[in-house]
Curated annotation (Swiss-Prot):
Transmembrane segment boundaries: 9-29, 44-64, 71-91
GO cellular component terms, semicolon-separated: plasma membrane
Subcellular location: Cell membrane
Protein name (record): Uncharacterized membrane protein YbgB
Keyword Translocase part of the UniProt annotation: no
Keyword Cell membrane set for record: yes
Xref: Pfam families: DUF1648 (PF07853)
Membrane-related topology note: Multi-pass membrane protein
Record keywords: Cell membrane, Membrane, Transmembrane, Transmembrane helix
Top-level taxon of origin: Bacteria
Amino acid sequence: MFLFTNGKVLWGAVIAAFILSIVFYPFLPTQMPIHYDVANSPDLTVNKLAGTVMLPVLMVVFAWARKINWQFVFAVYILLICHIVVLCLAL
C-alpha cells in the first residue's frame, strides 16, 4: 500500500515519465506508432512531441485528482507502464 498512500512516490513516477520522454525524444521517429493492427503493423501514428507529452500530462492530471478519489492513483501507475511501452515500441 506504500505506493498508493505516499504522494512522493506518486510524483516521482510522474517525474520519471517526463525524464523518460526527454531521454528518448532524440531517438524516436518523427511519427510514433501508438496502435497496431492484427498483423502487427502500425495503423495509427502521432507526432513525436504529442506522443512523448500526452501520457505524462495525463499522469499529472490524475495525480492531482487523487485528492478527489484515491483510485486515480492506479491510473497514474497504469499510464506510466503504457508510456514506457509506447516509447519502447516506437524505437
